Swiss-Prot record:
Residues 320-334 have a biased composition (Low complexity). Residues 1-250 form the IMD domain. Residues 295-369, 447-466, 525-552 are annotated as: Disordered. This is BAR/IMD domain-containing adapter protein 2. The keyword Coiled coil applies. The gene is BAIAP2. Transmembrane segments: none annotated. Keywords: Cell projection, Coiled coil, Cytoplasm, Cytoskeleton, Membrane, Phosphoprotein, SH3 domain. Isoform 1 and isoform 4 are expressed almost exclusively in brain. Isoform 4 is barely detectable in placenta, prostate and testis. A short isoform is ubiquitous, with the highest expression in liver, prostate, testis and placenta. Its main location: cytoplasm. The lineage of its organism: Eukaryota, Metazoa, Chordata, Craniata, Vertebrata. It is a peripheral membrane protein.
Length: 552
């Protein structure tokens, strides 16, 4: 190898070291920085995925508590579990990406900068030393030849000249070998770094392949079953069909008081002696469809093509899933319609009116007062009513107008449609007043005199004037109510305050108003308006007049 070839290789060796230090290492640092950003983004994806599948699990819990969608809840649980396993595999890939690639590359690049600087310096020093030794031998040989040319005896320097030539040849060989080895070492160092990067990237790719393979295996195994589970939305589970058939064969039951599960999705106990109510006119055209179709959603006891009006996704809060109704005849449909009534509590003995906070007073089965046979009667809410979690009840505010949809109240409950919210359901009839044909409201009264209204309506007589609360102690025991100021909350629902006054009256208050025979005369004094403006005598006189009237 000529000297010029050795110098060329020396320059190539230096360029390899400089390329590693000035280009490879900075690029590797940038690669590590981008890898950290990628890791951070994937960590954010895993965090979001955990929240996503936690929400999916909750949806599965809701579905599993439904009689009609229990198997879909199991499917949602399986989906969440499968994706949890896939997510665990992704986390393993992230750990490998961080530990086997980013961390080790970051450590290598910091150590490598110092190592390469030292290696290049060592190579340059050794190469310079060998080059200087060669140059020195060549200079000595040149001097020796000049001296032999001027000497009278040239043979005297021939042996020494041969020694210098051999030394120069050895020095030059050593230099060339060192430069060649240095170039090889530089290329090896460069290749070692790229191989390390590829090796670590292969480890990450291996984990990535395991992640995708695991996901493909799990999804390919479960996906057909999941698709089969949701292929027919109208298909009712066999257990729900059997339950509906059992309900239809055992008589009327009420889907009220749904409290057996978190979402209250159970069918309530049957009402003792409940009788089916007539089917509302708007249900008549759809009775045939109930028999023809496999299943039809029932909401608030109403079914038909206007089901969108009662969709829980349309204009109210989402209701819990309900099981669908099996095919029924017209009589069974009427039974199921009447069974949307709220569950009636057990009735106390007739000779006892004592109640507690968790009991309701017996509800009557009186007719709706003033209900027209040829038209729809309207009532006005005088109290607010909240349905709560029971989808069969109707919520309304004080002053709302309600159109009655059935001709007869059932145990103090009536079925109607709110003109404000367009929702339908059962509501306590004593919370409302019947509107006359001219739009004015009046208190409703029983059309069947042999039956009693709910205890909150015992005073609802148009020809009865109730004295103010201060007309004697006997009248204070019974709540004062008038036709124009009926603001006392009716007692068709559990209100324990009324039970204290009922013990004083016994069974006779059950059939008639105990104050119906009292005829009051108007007082001649007006001292109740402002007692503070009168003297002690005036107040005493006023109190005496009140006592006189009360005594009568």
């Amino acid at each position: 190898m000529s000297l010029s070839r050795s110098e060329e290789m020396h320059r190539l060796t230096e360029n390899v070291y400089k390329t590693i230090m000035e280009q490879f290492n900075p690029s590797l640092r940038n690669f590590i920085a981008m890898g950290k950003n990628y890791e951070k983004a994937l960590a954010g994806v895993t965090y979001a995925a955990k929240g996503y599948f936690d929400a999916l699990v909750k949806m599965g819990e809701l579905a599993s508590e439904s009689q009609g969608s229990k198997e879909l809840g199991d499917v949602l649980f399986q989906m969440a579990e499968v994706h949890r396993q896939i997510q665990n595999q992704l986390e393993e890939m992230l750990k490998s990406f961080h530990n086997e690639l980013l961390t080790q590359l970051e450590q290598k690049v910091e150590l490598d900068s110092r190592y390469l600087s030292a290696a290049l310096k060592k190579y340059q020093t050794e190469q310079r030393s060998k080059g200087d030794a060669l140059d020195k031998c060549q200079a000595e040989l040149k001097k020796l030849r000049k001296k032999s040319q001027g000497s009278k005896n040239p043979q005297k320097y021939s042996d020494k000249e041969l020694q210098y030539i051999d030394a120069i040849s050895n020095k030059q060989g050593e230099l060339e070998n060192y430069v060649s080895d240095g170039y090889k070492t530089a290329l090896t160092e460069e290749r070692r770094r790229f191989c390390f990067l590829v090796e670590k990237q292969c480890a990450v790719a291996k984990n990535s392949a395991a992640y995708h393979s695991k996901g493909k295996e799990l999804l390919a195994q479960k996906l057909p079953l999941w698709q089969q589970a949701c292929a027919d939305p109208s298909k009712i589970p066999e257990r729900a069909v059997q339950l509906m058939q059992q309900v239809a064969s055992n008589g009327a039951t009420l889907p009220s008081a749904l409290s057996a599960s978190k979402s209250n999705l159970v069918i309530s106990d049957p009402i003792p002696g409940a009788k089916p109510l007539p089917v509302p006119p708007e249900l008549a055209p759809f009775v045939g469809r109930m028999s023809a179709q496999e299943s039809t959603p029932i909401m608030n006891g109403v079914t038909g093509p206007d089901g969108e009006d009662y969709s829980p996704w349309a204009d109210r809060k989402a209701a819990q899933p309900k099981s669908l109704s099996p095919p029924q005849s017209q009589s069974k449909l009427s039974d199921s319609y009447s069974n949307t009534l709220p569950v009636r509590k057990s009735v106390t003995p007739k000779n006892s009116y004592a109640t507690t906070e968790n009991k309701t007073l017996p509800r009557s089965s009186s007719m709706a007062a003033g209900l027209e046979r040829n038209g729809r009667m309207r009532v006005k809410a005088i109290f607010s009513h909240a349905a709560g979690d029971n989808s069969t009840l109707l919520s309304f505010k004080e002053g709302d107008l309600i159109t009655l949809l059935v001709p007869e109240a059932r145990d103090g409950w009536h079925y109607g449609e709110s003109e404000k919210t367009k929702m339908r359901g059962w509501f306590p009839f004593s919370y409302t007043r019947v509107l006359d044909s001219d739009g004015s409201d009046r208190l409703h009264m029983s059309l069947q005199q042999g039956k009693s209204s709910s205890t909150g309506n015992l005073l609802d007589k148009d020809d009865l004037a109730i004295p103010p609360p201060d007309y004697g102690a006997a009248s204070r025991a019974f709540p004062a109510q008038t036709a124009s100021g009926f603001k006392q909350r009716p007692y068709s629902v559990a209100v324990p305050a009324f039970s204290q006054g009922l013990d004083d009256y016994g069974a006779r208050s059950m059939s008639r108003n105990p104050f119906a025979h009292v005829q009051l005369k108007p007082t001649v004094t007006n001292d109740r308006c402002d007692l503070s403006a009168q003297g002690p005598e005036g107040r005493e006189h006023g109190d005496g007049s009140a006592r006189t009237l009360a005594g009568r």
